[in-house]
Amino acid sequence: MRMRPSPRKAVFVLIDGARADVLRELVDRGDLPNLARWVLEPGGGLRIGTTVFPSTTGVAYIPFLFGRFPGNVGIPGIRWLDRAEAAGGWRAQWRAMRSYCGVQAGWINRDIAPGPSLFDLVPESIAICTPITRGLRPGAHRIPLQRAFFGAAAHYFGSYGALDRAVAQAWVATAAESWRLLFVVFPGVDGVTHLRDPKHPAVVARYRAVDDALGAFIARVRQHGELPAFFVAADHGATTMREHRDVAVELEALGVRTARHPMHVWRRGARVAAMVSGNASVQLYFEPRSGRTTPRTESEIPAAFLEPLLDYSALRLAAYRADQANESGQPEVIVRTQQGRARLSESPGLIRYEPLDGDPLGLGGYLELEDRELLLRSRDTDVPDAPRQLLQLFATPRAGDVVLAAVPGADFRGPWEIPEHKAGHGSLIREHMEVPIAASVPLPNDPIRTVDVMPAMLEYLGVPLPACDLDGMPFSKLVSRSTVPGAPCRSTNPRARWISARCRTPASQWIAGAASSRSSCPPSICQPVRVTMARNRPRASASFP
């Protein structure tokens, strides 16, 4: 009798806050031998993808677990305002000032719009250390108490090693169990980055801890059968913060009463509510106690508030809804900087970028392109995928009236925060939006979004994609344009993430972005070159030049 083959298995490892350049550096130095051997080599190397805006923990998990952009499922940030409840009594006001950073953290599971999660689609799933648990079977959410206890202690005392060790032990313990999908989150890189900087030796130690855990899991799981497929990614990047420009505090100094977390949730007579995400982005809601439930559009936004914000040295851009919507009723978006103003809109199959004054997104002028083409074009700017991300954010009426994104090195929350965030994320800038994506299965050469990982895992597992629309695409449908006759060769474009046998862009430039010009070599040779990773190099010093 012929035996049926065992169903495929997959493991997703989320290294919260991992920067692609740091990961690349550590791989090149031989500091992550297990990742190199078991993931990067069989999958063809590391890709750099783009995450979502706001680029912050929890919100940026949604693409991996739902295949959707956060705005399309009603989650505009890690903090946001429920306009309807904000005009109620003190209990309603507390509920309205939504924050997934404290006791309301679990509410994200009910706030996400109805739709199947990865755990619904793959019932034989186990998750470790994730705040989003919707769809998990009873008992499939591991170490919830340890996550709560060690997570709180780590936030105030920096003891992320204990939390990562708990994750590693729980992960290794699953090797002998029956499952089809493991979803494993390591919070340490992000947590220590906030306390130090993205390249601090203590942060590097957290990357190594993840690699050690991967090696321990592989050693254990090989005793029980074949290896699963591995998918590894981060949810956002990070930058060191040199300037804290606390919008809420500055508005208060101007006499504008501002509701904000954590101590001014019930601010009496509040004219503005400031809801920070990742610290490098903030959403402003005007007249939060008015009872108005609909967002404001351009003509309704007080210029007396907006214009001074545009002069902030910390501001990369501001965005808000245009007065008009598209034919589907979705809002068009106005993008502002001190020097420029542009309109973003979407029609079936196309996104339109229309500069009205200057070029605030740095795209070179008017564009009307298919979504993935615009993604590719935007990768050469300092705000990759900004058009799509701003449109998806304002797709939910829960988003603020005005959204601000910071420049590198700046955020919108003061040093009073306990502990002070010496590094952070949340903005639309490249350093926050670009993330590493790797897999032990072949990856496409076209630009990848984190929202593509969920359908790719389903495709690998042989699970049908849900009937509802997904914002991501399985890897098999991301056909490289380098194979299309007459397509331009992009082998030395650092955002295209491939290298050519003839053009010979070094891997370090391919990943870190040292090269900047497009090659003129013919498309026929624009094929990916496999990068061989060192397996047994000695560990280098845990410091960066």
PLM feature spans:
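Structural motif
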Residues: 12-14, 181-185, 231, 403, ...
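Active-site-proximal N-terminal segment of extracellular/periplasmic enzymes that hydrolyze or transfer
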Residues: 1-45
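His/Asp/Glu-rich, glycine-adjacent segments
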Residues: 60-201, 206-209, 336-380, 399, ...
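Substrate-binding rim/cap in mid-to-C-terminal beta-strand-loop elements of soluble/periplasmic
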Residues: 255-256, 261-293, 366, 422-460, ...
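Short, solvent-exposed turn/loop segments enriched in Gly/Ser/Thr/Pro and often Arg
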Residues: 45-65, 129-135, 471, 475
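Secreted, luminal/periplasmic, and some membrane-associated catalytic domains
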Residues: 24, 30, 42-59, 78-107, ...
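C-terminal substrate/ligand-recognition segments
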Residues: 383, 388-419, 426-466, 475
